[in-house]
Design a protein with these regions (language model features):
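Transmembrane alpha-helical segments of integral membrane proteins
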Residues: 56, 188-203
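Hydrophobic/aromatic residues within the transmembrane alpha-helices of Major Facilitator Superfamily
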Residues: 14, 18, 51-52, 88, ...
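Interfacial loop-to-transmembrane junctions
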Residues: 196-220
Length: 237
């Protein structure tokens, strides 16, 4: 077993894990707005997706996908579309929460402007905010984490590049298996840490007022990644 290779993989993957991106963003959103069990489920989902990318890269499947123009184009379009939808959804949720708070404040203040605010108006905005930022089940949390990483074309390219550079034909099967276990363990440790720490009641309470801001930032991150992928597709077309 090549310990120096495993150490190199660990360092590179650790840096990638803590870097801001879709995985980190979705963990912050879920952990600060959902239950701890849902946040942990999301952490497991992201980690399983990372394991899948690792296996696909080690077995050469990712290389086949990257080598096929049509297949890789499809992967990029689907992935970018998913990230764009997630970003739009986060932005819409943040705006809905802001609208709900403004309406509630005007109602409590007893404002009697020309525009009459009815209970139905408040409930309507509340239902939109609830539908977008409402409670998620553990299954929903797991699938959100899974799809966020698995459908991200940049993740596929990252792992393909990483293993293409470090895993040579001379590397033993035991080292390959150990590398997959190592990356899975590091992913579970990091995202599990975020899930536990950010889902604490004190943390969620402090960040509650910042929920629209968090949603907006996350929306921008997702849509920026999607835009970068779309732009690259147009430039290379």
């Amino acid at each position: 077993m090549d310990l120096s290779l495993l150490l190199t993989l660990a360092v590179i993957h650790a840096v990638a894990l803590i870097s801001p991106g879709p995985d980190f963003a979705i963990m912050v959103k879920i952990a600060t707005q959902q239950s701890r069990s849902t946040a942990v489920a999301a952490a497991v989902g992201i980690s399983i997706a990372i394991l899948a990318h690792t296996i696909l890269s080690l077995t050469g499947v990712s290389l086949l996908i990257k080598s096929s123009h049509t297949l890789y184009l499809l992967v990029q379009i689907v992935g970018a579309s998913y990230l764009a939808w997630m970003g739009f959804d986060a932005l819409r949720a943040g705006l809905a929460i802001l609208a709900k708070r403004k309406m509630s404040a005007r109602v409590h203040a007893g404002t009697n402007d020309d525009a009459v605010i009815s209970a139905g108006d408040v409930e309507g905005v509340a239902s939109v905010a609830g539908g977008l930022g409402g409670a998620m089940s553990r299954r929903q949390g797991f699938l959100t984490g899974l799809y966020t990483n698995l459908l991200n074309p940049k993740a596929l390219v990252f792992f393909l590049t990483l293993f293409s550079a470090l895993i040579t034909p001379s590397v033993t099967t035991s080292t390959k298996i150990a590398s997959a276990i190592l990356l899975l363990s590091l992913s579970l440790a990091w995202f599990g840490f975020l899930a536990v720490m950010l889902s604490k009641a004190q943390v969620q309470l402090k960040l509650q007022r910042l929920t629209p801001v968090i949603d907006a930032v996350i929306g921008v991150i997702f849509m920026s990644v999607a835009l970068a992928i779309y732009s690259n597709l147009l430039l290379t077309a």
